[in-house]
Amino acid sequence: MKAKLIAATEIDPGALRDIGFEVDDFEESKDEDPYFGDFDADELAEFAGRNCYRSFHRPNPATAENEDYLNHIIDLGHESVFEHASATFYIEASRSVLTELERHRHLSFSVVSQRYVDPTDLGIHLPPALFKLHPDDRDDLVHIMESVSSEIDAVYEHIVNRLADRGLPRKQAREAARAVLPNMTNSPMVVTGNHRAWRYVIKARWHEAADAEIRELAGELLRQLRQIAPNTYQDIPDVPYSY
């Protein structure tokens, strides 16, 4: 599984100051990507909330700091302010994870085409459960699943070539042959969501009852989102939710 933050909303501090909202002078982390270290999403959420009451001057000392203000917003459940900023990830995960993730309709997807791209070149993602086993069991099952994948690749290529030999365009041949591909097939995708959407995804998938691979993905998304919007995700635990 791979997840990489590739884009995030940036604010125009000068424009906000002209309106009357003074932007906090955050110090960027020395350990993180400098392009995504200024917490613009947190600032934008606060600005949006304060605009509702024209409270840019921060009259309440208890919510004068961004962290405290957003904590109050979260407590009240007024999460629409988190919709103004977005984050985009490049993700490589199994087709199974794609199916789960696409159920979150508030996310936007661009996914590799199995009609135009040969999926056998993209690799596979083995279930996380295998890597919790004793090494002997793990190695045996990894070998079995990789062998099955190789066999399916051969069957896939045979079907594609057979159909192409009968005159079908390659994309139509791949369209038919993809029926034999397993759920562990790698499915590179670009996924964008606003921070309210990402909060919903993580709160649903960062849970011990969730599918193991998507839970692992949710944890990685949370880690990276906290680098750009720590106060937006301040209420989400470092370990998966439990019953």
Curated annotation (Swiss-Prot):
Pathway(s) served: Pyrimidine metabolism; dTTP biosynthesis
Enzyme Commission number: 2.1.1.148
Active site positions, chain numbering: 205 (involved in ionization of n3 of dump, leading to its activation)
GO BP annotation list: dTMP biosynthetic process; dTTP biosynthetic process; methylation
CDD domains for the chain: ThyX
Main EC class the enzyme belongs to: transferase
Positions that bind FAD: 80, 103-105, 194-196
This protein's name: Probable flavin-dependent thymidylate synthase
